[in-house]
Amino acid sequence: MVSARFRFYEELNDFLAPQHRGREFSRSCARAATTKHMIEALGVPHTEVELVLVNGESVGFDRILHDGDRVSVYPKFEAFDVAPLLRVRDRPLRES
C-alpha cells in the first residue's frame, strides 16, 4: 500500500464524503493504483474531471500513484483555456 494526498476542487466536492470536501486528505492506495482508479474509488466520476496534477505536474488517468504523491483534481474550466495542460483527454470538456 502507498499513501497519497488528494484535493478536489469546485463542484467535484459534491461527489465526496462531507469530511473530505474543500480540503486535502490522505488516502491509502493499492501499490499499482492509477489516478483514475483512485478518483473513481473516492466517488468522483472520471468523466467530470478535466485536469489532474500530481506533485504539480499535469498527468493522465493512467499515472500510477506513488507514496507521498499530492493529487489535485479539477473539473471543467470555464474562464480560461487549459488545452495545453491536458493529459486526461484530447480537448477540453467545455468548448468556448
Annotate each PLM feature.
Residues 1-96:
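Ubiquitin-like/PB1-type beta-grasp interaction modules and other compact soluble beta-rich domains
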